[in-house]
Amino acid sequence: MTASGKSTIVNLLSQRLGFDVMPEEFRDPLDLLSRFHHDHKWAFPMQLNFLVTRFAQYLCASEKDNYILDRSVFGDKVYAMLYYRSGYFKDSQFGCYLTLYDSLLRNVKAPKLFVVVRCEFDEIMRRIQSRGRQDEIDVGVDYWKSLYDAYMPFLDFLQNELQRDITFYELELSDPTFIETPSKVTAFLEDVQKFFPERKILPPHES
């Protein structure tokens, strides 16, 4: 979920545990995102573009054990379901999307650890307003609330529908002081390190 703290955690894991961050690649040569903001009929081609781009990025990252991702292809379906429920996808388009999604993800390598970041909605909206990105502000509170609600069953979806052996770690980040509280940061890093015992936790001044 946007503004939940994903990038903060990814950067923390990179700096303190030595992971390489796979930057989110955004390919939009046809300006589909901008077209979608002006006319929702572009939702389907836009989301297909995101799905294929994120899938290619995930394949690249999964070739090595050192990469971490801010956002993975697994969560792409959350947006597609939201747009379908909002009437932006036709039934046939949603069916086509699901067929492609299932086909692409059927044989991908499961991540070694999936960190699920939780954050209260009011705190997410406070962060969106605070960082002042106009494109995020312009879509309005109703959109963010719909997306937030769509993300709530996401963990159950991954566990039940994908039928994959994925280890989940849930992290509550509603507290804006988390990253500034050494005891909380250390506890989190130690928990993650249990899944990667070969990694050493670096002190902040060495990161």
Model region roles, listed by residue range:
Residues I9, L13:
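Hydrophobic positions on the alpha1 helix immediately C-terminal to the Walker A/P-loop
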Residues Q15-A56, A80:
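Conserved substrate/cofactor phosphate-moiety recognition/catalytic segment
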Residues Y79-M152:
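A glycine- and Lys/Arg-enriched "phosphate-lid" helix/loop adjacent to the NTP-binding pocket
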